[in-house]
Regions:
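Small-residue-enriched flexible segments
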Residues: 1-176
Length: 177
């Protein structure tokens, strides 16, 4: 499947040594173990925090304080370069497995921040949350995406040498990844 084109004929389909601008190309994988890796392209900023008040997809409090206040304070502590990334690539990572002592790449399910309400001090995200869950703010940039992808590939290659790969990308992870 080739998607994302603005008009028919723009996507390129590859079949053996041919490059096509229409039609379809299929891949059949049989009797081969598959391993999926996902580079979310985000790196954590600040510290992990526990949601203390939330309703549906709206985080009202983190650690007993207004979520927006914590977000504003975090912004002030960042270097200028990271503040620029923060303004266009801020995400929230929700911990997948709470039963760990510390968290690292792959331990978070990354979600978009869909809005903030400065008056109420709340943050809305693209997922339902509940009190007691651990979150951490993340920023998305191409350097993080590339580093995380390289680490995941190295970890996977230690088990066996890959014979092939399928790569799916998006602009949020960086145009050059």
């Amino acid at each position: 499947i080739a998607s994302g084109a603005q008009a028919p004929g723009i996507s390129r389909l590859l079949l053996d040594d041919q490059s096509l601008d229409s039609g379809w190309v299929g891949v059949r994988i049989c009797n081969t173990p598959l391993r999926t890796i996902v580079s979310q392209g985000c790196r954590p900023i600040g510290d992990p925090m526990v949601i203390t008040q939330a309703e549906r997809n709206i985080i009202q409090q983190l650690g007993g304080r207004r979520a927006f206040d914590i977000l504003s304070e975090l912004f002030q502590t960042l270097p200028t370069r990271e503040q620029r990334i923060f303004q266009s690539g801020l995400q929230i990572g929700r911990v997948i497995n709470e039963y760990q002592d510390s968290f690292q790449y792959g331990d978070f399910l990354i979600r978009n921040i869909t809005g903030v309400d400065k008056g109420l001090g709340s943050i809305s995200i693209g997922d339902y949350v509940r009190p007691g869950q651990t979150i951490q703010f993340h920023i998305r940039d191409h350097e993080s995406a590339s580093a995380e992808f390289s680490q995941l590939v190295k970890t996977g290659a230690a088990d066996s040498i890959p014979k092939a790969a399928l790569l799916f990308t998006c602009n949020g992870r960086g145009l050059n990844l």
